[in-house]
Amino acid sequence: MKLFLVSIVLVGMLVLAAARPERDIDSFDEQEEKGFVKRGASCDCHPFVGTYWFGISNCPSGHGYRKKCASFFGVCCVK
């Protein structure tokens, strides 16, 4: 019975993953044009104040960032 339930859950997950649209996430530039881009929090990049971006190791291109500092699970970018 337990194996049957686990199998049903796994099959359901596979069906949902396969049903996902091929291109459901717009590029960063397309999001910016639509006004969907969220800004990061402020951070210190000694002695400057920058924008903290979580989960990436480089600053987003095309935004005029000229300096970056590594931060906890992300990067601090300074214009």
Curated annotation (Swiss-Prot):
Disulfide bonds join C43-C76, C45-C69, C59-C77. Keywords: Antibiotic, Antimicrobial, Cleavage on pair of basic residues, Disulfide bond, Immunity, Innate immunity, Ion channel impairing toxin, Nematocyst, Neurotoxin, Secreted, Signal, Toxin. It comes from the Eukaryota. Highly expressed by the mesenteries. Moderately expressed by the pharynx. Weakly expressed by the gonad and pedal disk. No expression in tentacle. InterPro entries: BDS_K_chnl_tox, Myo_ane_neurotoxin_sf. It is found in: Secreted; Nematocyst. One of its GO terms (cellular component) is nematocyst. Peptide with both antimicrobial and neurotoxin activities. Cationic AMP with antibacterial activity against both Gram-positive bacteria (B.subtilis, MIC=11.49 ug/mL) and Gram-negative bacteria (E.coli (MIC=12.21 ug/mL) and S.enterica (MIC=11.95 ug/mL)). Shows no significant antimicrobial activity against bacteria S.aureus and P.aeruginosa, as well as the fungus C.albicans. In vivo, induces reversible paralytic activity towards the shrimp P.paucidens. May act by impairing sodium or potassium channels in the prey. This is Crassicorin-I. It comes from Urticina crassicornis.
